[in-house]
Regions:
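Active-site segments that bind and position negatively charged phosphate/pyrophosphate groups
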Residues: 1-65
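C-terminal charged capping/lid subdomain of soluble metabolic enzymes
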Residues: 36, 40-42, 46-121
């Protein structure tokens, strides 16, 4: 999903990854809750005794806080506007890249469109 943001809006790949990370992580958790809970514990954002669900919630919360602390902008705050047609095109391009298939929860085109809409704000 990062590549289309960079290609259409000239956003650096790492920055587009940062823009997407909290929302895509939140979406992906149901695909492997244990793995994401392990990440939260490794980052010291969750305790060993926390349930996977609680640890995952803390992970997502802290990813949003980290983005706030680092002042990671949204595409919209950078002045980039996109409409449903652009989101559809970007979703098709993201799927064509093959990258979404590496996600623990493989998104559909409509789910990718929705994620872009949410990231845009």
């Amino acid at each position: 999903m990062s590549r289309p943001i960079g290609a259409h809006f000239h956003v650096a790949h790492g920055l587009s990854n940062a823009m997407l990370l909290p929302k895509v992580t939140e979406f992906s958790i149901e695909g492997n809750q244990e793995r994401y809970a392990t990440c939260a514990r490794a980052m010291k954002w969750a305790k060993e005794k926390d349930s996977h669900e609680v640890a995952c919630s803390k992970l997502v919360e802290n990813l949003y806080l980290l983005n706030d602390d680092l002042k990671v902008p949204s595409p919209k705050s950078l002045g980039h506007s996109a409409d449903k047609d652009m989101f559809r095109l970007m979703a098709s391009q993201a799927l064509a890249s093959g990258s979404p298939q590496n996600n623990p929860r493989v998104p559909t085109k409509n789910q990718i469109i929705h994620l872009y809409e949410e990231v845009w704000g």
